[in-house]
Amino acid sequence: MSVLAALAAIGVLAVLIAVHELGHFAAARLQGIHVTRFALGFGPPLLKYQGAETEYSIRAIPLGGYVAFPDDDPDSEIPADDPNLLKNRPILDRAIVISAGVIANLVFAYFLLIGQVSTIGFQNIQPGLVIPQVDSASAAQVAGMEPGDIVLSLQGNTLPGFPDATTQFIDIVRRSPSVPITVEVQRGEETKTLTITPTPDAEGKGKIGVALLPNVETKRASNPLEALTYSAEAFERIVKLTTQGFWQLISNFADNASQVAGPVKIVEYGANIARSDASNLFQFGALISINLAVINILPLPALDGGQLVFLLIEGLLGKPLPEKFQMGVMQTGLVLLLSLGVFLIVRDTLNLTFVQEFLPSFTGYE
């Protein structure tokens, strides 16, 4: 993981957190609600600026950010009955402020996708596999396969998109040493049917001597309407995949807990993208922005969704729950959230390749 690639990924993550907090901040200020603090990160401030009413800061622990209101400050000079305190506003006004961070992340993700599809384009996965290379004198070459062919089906089984297509292709070939298999390929505008007999390797498994790549189609908008349409399709697909992923995590947490990624893992993933193809940082940013929105809307303490639950209860009961109870729940949730963040940072840091290589020599163990 190169330093520049890591910095690019960190920059993307920082921008997305800033967008989320700016959503809360803008929703409050546009309604005339007092805001005392706008912070990126938690813990002691690294940089700080005091505005006319609001303190702006970048803090040491990069696990999120927050917008603070004088309602939470017992030393605030603003009268408790000030109509522009958040707590004195109607439920709808407060709900707008609380949900604005999620909305900001979703809107920003959509505009990132518009930016990508308008300038670079999307690479959409299509069914089948591309053959970029055919080994000399291999079973595939003998059968007439050529570089650039797109494999559509094997043994009458239509290939899905990547990565399932790769798994299916390799499985069929390996299980068929010295057994002819029928392969349908697309070559230019033509469709051809080839019969390939995999040769056994040293382990007795079949091989045909080709390299495999995903079959991708680059979509680039030629006008504003196409940009909006393509971006909407990509946005819908990412939201659907994200919500499905969270549902699988929640419904089968024991098996999927190891897949939960913290900031370090996200930065590593983003750095790999930046190193291989920086243009994909648009889509990476949109993906993480949508993930931030989905995470924050979950009805859990210390998250925006948890605060919306309190508002819902207030609307049903006609009065808010006791303030001490709400504060206790939120503080407990914040401690648990920070603890989870620290755990994920430590775990993901220890799993980084260069750390894994460093630890044996540092500890003296092999």
Curated annotation (Swiss-Prot):
CDD domains: S2P-M50_PDZ_RseP-like (cd06163). Pfam families: PDZ_2 (PF13180), Peptidase_M50 (PF02163). SMART domains: PDZ. One of its GO terms (cellular component) is plasma membrane. GO terms for biological process: proteolysis. The active site is at residue 21. It is an enzyme of class 3 (hydrolase). Keywords: Cell inner membrane, Cell membrane, Hydrolase, Membrane, Metal-binding, Metalloprotease, Protease, Transmembrane, Transmembrane helix, Zinc. Its cofactor is Zn(2+). Residues 106-188 form the PDZ domain. Zn(2+) binds at residues 20, 24. The keyword Transmembrane applies. One of its GO terms (molecular function) is metal ion binding. It is a multi-pass membrane protein. Its EC number is 3.4.24.-. Belongs to the peptidase M50B family. This is Putative zinc metalloprotease slr1821. The lineage of its organism: Bacteria, Bacillati, Cyanobacteriota, Cyanophyceae, Synechococcales.
